[in-house]
């Protein structure tokens, strides 16, 4: 009991983060403008000098505390349009500025922790691919996974309350609460639709910060459980999940864990050294080498704990228990599973020989071909059946520019899916992009694909649509036999920080 109370002890820091005065500093909004502002928004407001003025911010805060300040009169349509445009502009200014301000104490803590532990290359951990080497080393030993869909908080007030444990500045939190309740449509943030508000489209920074704080809140329990159950005590996760606990939660945790005679004897159901937790965006995975009964206990425990102590409504049907040998796990654009790779070893002792069948577990990462084709169809590169089609392009685009844009998409896909175990599935994607590019150029020149390729030459397309593996073979032709092993193996890169959304490319043509 004493160990739990020490772990959950409220940190009595003498330093207070007073962020409210920063809201009225113009240089803060200049930084926010450089980092996240879109100048297209500013151009929609005539008479604005592309500068986040202190007077505008003060005027915004004053209007926020006034009642009915955006009542629209049906008799003045011009004024209505002006108020709507300025409301979106004020929306943009205060959200970007507040997101920049509230990140300051967290950035300072993280920088000080990283400098203290001399982690020079911590930026490599931002890469999406950095998680897959961990999966390769550990998932082959696991049997079951809990596939968890993380729910959103049921009310904006929960996000403000969570942030209150980090930032002890009542004025800033009160302004944030008023801002969210007054302007934000939380449903449009969770499920953005066509024609949604400007905030849901362009102000993702503040929402992502609040959502990550919300997720970090309930993930803090894993640090405690890991320190209690694992032989290797956690030394790095505490930096990322460091938080300030309050006394009411301490009492509730004591009721959960310590209302027993012998705490260590009743922690057996979570005492699993090989339990691993992974999260990305709205999905998390809990993997273990335990049995199905063990995973069911974890499922019941997590659902009950999160619902009662973190105000999260986890529907039990949103948590799936899958066996890795029978199910593929959709995670970060890959289909991952653990399959048995049979191998036959011949052993000979004197005149007798034996054939020994060994089944070795192997972690596979495959390219989800059907979702990729669906993304290509959504971006108008092909139809729903995967047949390439031509894309409408502007007449002022040159042939080399069109080829370069198609080639960039192809290279990005090859770069991201370089960790696939079977790269032959990427050939169909490359074929769709290559033929779609040829049909687009033929449509521009009002010719057929065959006549266009015969006149221009297919080598030109192959030059622009060359994958990274092809570049290796052409650069080092004498080492082709050695590079063939590299081509067949998985390659993980440490410069990938987002998943390519093919739907975003359709606006570039």
UniProtKB/Swiss-Prot annotation:
What protein name applies here?
A: Maturase K
Its function, per the record, reads: Usually encoded in the trnK tRNA gene intron. Probably assists in splicing its own and other chloroplast group II introns.
Q: Does the keyword Transmembrane helix apply?
A: no
> Where is the chain membrane-spanning?
none
Keyword annotations of the record: Chloroplast, mRNA processing, Plastid, RNA-binding, tRNA processing
**Any one Gene Ontology molecular-function term assigned to this protein's record:** RNA binding
Q: Which Pfam families does this one have?
A: Intron_maturas2, MatK_N
Methyltransferase as UniProt keyword: no
The family note in this entry says:
Belongs to the intron maturase 2 family. MatK subfamily.
């Amino acid at each position: 009991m004493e160990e739990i109370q020490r772990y959950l002890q409220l940190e009595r820091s003498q330093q207070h983060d007073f962020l409210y005065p920063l809201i009225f500093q113009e240089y803060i909004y200049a930084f926010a403008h450089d980092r996240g502002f879109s100048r297209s928004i500013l151009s929609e407001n005539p008479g604005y000098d592309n500068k986040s003025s202190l007077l505008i911010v003060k005027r915004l805060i004053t209007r926020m505390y006034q009642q009915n300040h955006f009542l629209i009169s049906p008799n003045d349509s011009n004024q209505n349009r002006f108020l709507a445009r300025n409301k979106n502009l004020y929306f943009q200014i205060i959200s970007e500025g507040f997101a920049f301000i509230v990140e300051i104490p967290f950035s300072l803590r993280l920088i000080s922790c990283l400098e203290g532990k001399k982690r020079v290359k911590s930026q490599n951990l931002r890469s999406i691919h950095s998680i897959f080497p961990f999966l390769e080393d550990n998932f082959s030993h696991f049997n079951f996974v809990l596939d968890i869909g993380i729910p959103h908080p049921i009310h904006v007030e929960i996000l403000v309350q969570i942030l209150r444990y980090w930032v002890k500045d009542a004025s800033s939190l009160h302004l944030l609460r008023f801002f969210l309740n007054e302007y934000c449509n939380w449903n449009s943030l969770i499920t953005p639709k066509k024609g949604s508000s400007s905030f849901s489209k362009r102000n993702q920074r503040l929402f992502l910060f609040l959502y990550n704080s919300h997720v970090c809140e309930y993930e803090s329990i894993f640090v405690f459980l890991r320190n209690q159950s694992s032989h290797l005590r956690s030394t790095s996760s505490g930096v990322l999940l460091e938080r300030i606990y309050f006394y009411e939660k301490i009492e509730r945790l004591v009721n959960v864990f310590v209302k027993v005679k012998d705490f260590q004897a009743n922690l057996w159901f979570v005492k699993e050294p090989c339990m691993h937790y992974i999260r990305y965006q709205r999905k998390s995975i809990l993997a273990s080498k335990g049995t199905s009964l063990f995973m069911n206990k974890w499922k019941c425990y997590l659902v009950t704990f999160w619902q009662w102590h973190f105000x999260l409504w986890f529907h039990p049907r949103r948590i799936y228990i899958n066996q890795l040998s029978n199910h593929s796990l959709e995670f970060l654009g890959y289909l991952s599973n653990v399959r048995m790779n049979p191998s036959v070893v011949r052993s000979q002792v004197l005149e007798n020989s034996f054939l020994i069948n060994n089944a070795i577990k192997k972690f596979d990462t495959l390219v989800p071909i059907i979702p990729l084709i669906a993304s290509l169809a959504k971006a108008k590169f092909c139809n729903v059946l995967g047949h390439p089609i031509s894309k409408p392009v502007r007449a002022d685009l040159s042939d080399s520019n069109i080829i370069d844009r198609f080639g960039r998409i192809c290279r990005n896909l090859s770069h991201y899916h370089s960790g696939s175990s079977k790269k032959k599935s990427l050939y169909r994607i490359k074929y769709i992009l290559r033929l779609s590019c040829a049909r687009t150029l033929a449509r521009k020149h009002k010719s057929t694909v065959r006549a266009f390729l015969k006149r221009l030459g297919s080598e030109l397309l192959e030059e622009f649509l060359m994958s990274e593996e092809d570049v290796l073979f052409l650069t080092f032709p004498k080492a082709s036999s050695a590079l063939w092993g590299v081509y067949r193996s998985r390659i993980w890169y440490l410069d990938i920080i987002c998943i390519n959304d093919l739907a975003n490319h359709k606006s570039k043509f």
